Regions:
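Short C-terminal tail/terminal secondary-structure segment
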Residues: 2-9, 26, 158, 218-222, ...
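Active-site helix of classical SDR
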Residues: 132, 169, 177
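Alpha-helical segment proximal to the catalytic Tyr-Lys
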Residues: 137, 182-186, 244
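Substrate-binding pocket helix/loop in short-chain dehydrogenase/reductase
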Residues: 108-109, 116-121, 204, 212, ...
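Catalytic Tyr-X3-Lys loop
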Residues: 103, 110-129, 149, 173, ...
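Canonical Rossmann dinucleotide-binding motif of NAD(H)/NADP(H)-dependent dehydrogenases/reductases
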Residues: 9-43
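Residue(s) in the substrate-gating loop at a strand-loop-helix junction
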Residues: 153
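C-terminal substrate-recognition "lid" of short-chain dehydrogenase/reductases
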Residues: 91, 189-190, 224-254
């Protein structure tokens, strides 16, 4: 299955969406594409500036000035603030924040270093916290509601060898999502998350052997990994008004749960 353009239904017409870790062909890039196809104006960000520029140019070729980009490392609070302020300044407001930035890796807890633990938690959990907080402050100041969609993982529910840091970070994203939802419900802001299982991603292919990827895919009832756009479709739903009564939810995008 390939990430091809899908017919838009105007689910996000007129909305301004910010997507982190949106460079390339992973879930973030697919989410940006789907939001554009659904009528949104989209600010994309990534810490990899060359890949970000290439993605921006590709998206702008089909969607013109509805695409804007700014490099951002989510471990840097000043860069996160600049992203939110820049997107709001460029498009006039922010309606949706999609927090996709995360970092994985494999290490037994017996061998895991403090640096490995800290790096994964800083990007995956604390980075999501920084971006969520900045977006919520902007949305509260605007006064017309909004939505945040975080990218968690089924590993926030399940145990897997060598994944203590990543699983802890994703479980934290789930808890952050639920608590943030209660903090801002009075402002008509919704906070939800998706929890994919195995999904196709260039980074995953770099850090995981082909044999292990094949084994993991074979465990899925569908016998394959999810395509990025299949996860992005659920993100778009949660960002849209179709999910207007959903908040604090973690939606499994998986063929098995939890």
């Amino acid at each position: 299955m390939t990430d091809t353009a899908m017919p838009g239904h105007g689910l996000l017409d007129g909305k301004v969406v910010v997507v982190t870790a949106a460079a390339g062909t992973g879930i973030g890039g697919a989410a940006a594409r789907r939001c554009l196809e659904e009528g949104a104006r989209v600010a994309i960000s990534d810490q990899h500036h060359k890949r970000l520029a290439a993605t921006r140019d590709e998206l702008a070729a089909g969607h013109g000035d509805r695409v804007w980009s700014l490099g951002c490392d989510v471990t840097d609070e000043a860069q996160v603030a600049a992203l939110v302020e820049g997107a709001a300044g460029h498009f006039g407001r922010i309606d949706v924040m999609i927090n996709n930035a995360g970092l994985g890796g494999t290490a037994s807890l017996l061998d895991m270093t403090d640096e490995q633990w800290d790096r994964v938690l800083d990007v995956t959990l604390t980075g999501t916290f920084r971006c969520t907080r900045a977006a919520l402050r902007q949305m509260v100041a605007q006064g017309h509601g909004g939505a945040v969609v975080n990218n968690a993982s089924v590993l926030g529910w399940r145990a897997q060898p060598g994944q203590a840091h990543y699983a802890a970070a994703k479980a934290g994203v789930m808890a952050l999502t639920r608590c943030a939802a209660l903090d801002v419900a009075a402002h008509r802001i919704r906070v939800n998350a998706v929890a994919p299982s195995l999904a196709v991603h260039p980074y995953l292919a770099k850090v995981t052997s082909e044999d292990l990827l094949a084994e993991l895919a074979s465990r899925e009832p569908f016998g394959r990994a999810a395509e990025p756009w299949e996860v992005a479709n659920v993100i778009v739903f949660l960002a849209s008004d179709y999910a207007a009564y959903m908040t604090g939810e973690v939606v499994s995008v998986s063929s098995q749960h939890p």
